[in-house]
């Protein structure tokens, strides 16, 4: 006899795996069949639905961090954000490959995050979304960074790379909301630039959710006192964001452009430093053995100077030149060092200057926006602060041009030195010297002498002991990340323009001229520029943050469970924003008679509006098998629950009297039957929201649910946590040991059958449930459909008021 499965339709297992490390966080991609995991080893893993196959792994490292606390997907599913507690960093990772596209530091360790997308539509926003970014038309494309340098520059090092487009994402505003300890809450536009810092909330954030209409922010916090935790729900008004949404979107888009350009400039400087160190190390490696083996007390500089003046080299220097360096090696070394010098020069011209010019463009546009005070002054955009930032960028460009002149001068000396040394070595080997190489003017000798003076000073303390016998002081001093003045600043004596400015008090203080810092390094001026830009863009975050006022505070419950036993990252509560009906939902459990009863709190995103059935508790009564009409009655405790989609909640239950291995259930709970309009008046909360909810359990209306469909017994698994994804119609269940994962397809055709008669028979035989796949004949299928049609009208779930007899 053919029988239907335990759950109807069946939740089909599509993947199962035992993982080597404990999983502490998992979240489905909003758009694809991918699930991101974080484990106790500090790894971030990406798995595909099919057979739970691993796509990639982002291992822990010193730069990013090793203690992952939470994950969040960008709404388009192209970027994954994760927070690290040990380094207090947020990393944005590409979904295609385990590479950091962007990272930033925060003030406190992040305990939860939420990434939302704005759904509000308006004609102003639509025109902005559809308009082409003018910067793409007016600004040249940023040159790609050379691949042979730091790995951190991958985002800007691919030809025709779309990483920048991936990083900036769609023009439609999306906001990454971060929550941490001591009331730390910050909002980042496009996941990159801070646009709000919320104050006035106490405790550690357990969950948060910014509504898609930008009208309110829901936060759940925990305040620990005397070994127990007070958990409360807050709702904050965010009317400033809602009222000025077009302006916030434009401003935030500019902020992200500026943030990306600052990262580009930083990476360009990193490449320049590496090229400079390459020159140092190449020359040093050639000179180290010579210095260690020479018997004379003369310095390397003296040895070369003696050769320049008298045309004769000491035995040690001759051995170095002829045996260790060789004529061929000298040519190769010269070409290599010239290439490194050229790389620095190219990075300044192509990368620093183009990046700085783009930065000037976006800051100038931002200044124009700030001048429209009616629109942007309420958001805290300050034209004077932006003007100061523009001036700082101008100073940076001046310093970059100064470095170019120094490089050009050093290149002349360098070429003269290597040409002279090449001729000297040819003479030592008595090879023929070409007449054009033999000519050496007094100017050439001066260049060589300058090169020897500048580069062969023994400087053990320079640059963290890099370049002990050879230094590139004139170029390197610009790349030092220190506050010290330049060792050899440029000579401004005789510079007519400089003298003219110094002698003119009007021009000297003119705001039209960029200030010049002749004694400071490029790194110093760059850091100053970054600080000024950060300060001018920080003001909107302060203004918007202060505008977010606490409108509602509901104390939920007192939690005495230890942090170790409940695994902070999976613990209730769970927040959800229904974008269609503009509602905030909060799932949490209250301990009653040693059982955890699930409660659903809902609030309208608009603080001024109320909603019926604002608080309701759910009791799980009976579960009926489809054809045998066998009813499974027991006492169920809610272990975990998450929203599957706007209409359904996925729940993991524990049968408190069931046998181990058959005591966990996976249930789909439709909200349409929880909030039944016909009897909604009977399920009104009669208590007060000012008193802790767990102290007034009797006042919370309880609806008992009886299931005929949409449930499944989780055999041979101590299921504890669940993550659902209504878009892909899948759910992932995690066991209490945090290693065993089982993935279910939730909406499938009725094609699976169960060969069992009842729970009692299975338990008596002590055999596990066996599921087998069978193909129905056409006649059997017709008979089955006819039988189903003859039954009473199809009711998926029976909903009744609390009836003690049913559960006895």
From Swiss-Prot:
One of the GO BP terms on file: regulation of meiotic cell cycle
Domain of life, source organism: Eukaryota
Pathway: Protein modification; protein ubiquitination
Cellular component per GO, a single term: nuclear periphery
Annotated positions of the Phosphotyrosine modification: 469
Pfam assignment, any one: ANAPC4
UniProt KW keywords: Cell cycle, Cell division, Isopeptide bond, Mitosis, Nucleus, Phosphoprotein, Ubl conjugation, Ubl conjugation pathway
Gene Ontology molecular functions: protein phosphatase binding; ubiquitin-protein transferase activity
Phosphoserine modification, residue list: 757-758, 777, 779
Primary localization class, coarse: nucleus
Subcellular location, record wording: Nucleus
Protein's job: Component of the anaphase promoting complex/cyclosome (APC/C), a cell cycle-regulated E3 ubiquitin ligase that controls progression through mitosis and the G1 phase of the cell cycle. The APC/C complex acts by mediating ubiquitination and subsequent degradation of target proteins: it mainly mediates the formation of 'Lys-11'-linked polyubiquitin chains and, to a lower extent, the formation of 'Lys-48'- and 'Lys-63'-linked polyubiquitin chains. The APC/C complex catalyzes assembly of branched 'Lys-11'-/'Lys-48'-linked branched ubiquitin chains on target proteins.
Subunit architecture: The mammalian APC/C is composed at least of 14 distinct subunits ANAPC1, ANAPC2, CDC27/APC3, ANAPC4, ANAPC5, CDC16/APC6, ANAPC7, CDC23/APC8, ANAPC10, ANAPC11, CDC26/APC12, ANAPC13, ANAPC15 and ANAPC16 that assemble into a complex of at least 19 chains with a combined molecular mass of around 1.2 MDa; APC/C interacts with FZR1 and FBXO5. In the context of the APC/C complex, directly interacts with UBE2S. Interacts with FBXO43.
Protein name as catalogued: Anaphase-promoting complex subunit 4
Higher taxonomy: Eukaryota, Metazoa, Chordata, Craniata, Vertebrata
Encoding gene, per UniProt annotation: ANAPC4
